[in-house]
Amino acid sequence: LYTIHYDVDIEKARAELQGSKTDMSFGENYIYAEAIIAAALYAREKYKGTGTPDFFCTPHLVNVMLLARDMNGRRIYNSKTDLAAALNVGNLYTAEQFEGKVRIDDEAHKHKLLGIFVNLADYTVGSTKGGEITRFDQFDIDFNQQKYLIETRISGALTRVYSAIALENPTDNI
């Protein structure tokens, strides 16, 4: 309910760019980047979050889009700023934790996570037991050092409906 799941259709982007001669004129990175940007912009039509969202994705996805080239070999996006402008986001952030994440929907289809658009102003962080913080300290005789550990438990959740977009690649053979 809080997250919009939107599939990226790479084959449709390949067909729209140049029909049957796409591979001769554009590289895979360009096709992939254009498919992601088109999906991101169409998904934003349903976005109900506040402000401008940021894009969180794997470092590999950022590299694929930055390495996209046109027919003459020139890069389409010269910097992360150009790429963020094309995606209509405030900033791009990399998250290695997204690598290999797969969601299985109600019909048992697999969707590989490509990235998440979210404005963290729509995300609320809280804690249990009034924000209880536990402190431990102990003297380590082997190293002649006093060691400290501070521990707390926190939780968080989106607080606005449709305030995040998860771009996914539908696939059943991962």
Language model regions located:
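Long, contiguous amphipathic alpha-helices that act as assembly "spine/axial" helices in icosahedral shell
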Residues: 1-20, 46-60, 134-160
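Alpha-helical scaffold segments that mediate packing/assembly in large oligomeric complexes
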Residues: 1-42, 166-174
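Generic hydrophobic, helix-prone segments enriched in Leu/Val/Ile
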Residues: 14-16, 39-40, 47, 65-68, ...
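Short non-domain terminal segments
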Residues: 15, 24, 28-30, 53, ...
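Alpha-helix initiation/capping motif
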Residues: 25, 32, 36, 58, ...
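Extended alpha-helical or coil "stalk/linker/tether" regions that are enriched in polar/charged
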Residues: 32-57, 66-79
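Generic detector of multi-pass transmembrane helix bundles and their immediately adjacent loops
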Residues: 54-68, 88-92, 133
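Sequence/fold signature of self-assembling virion shell proteins
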Residues: 71-174
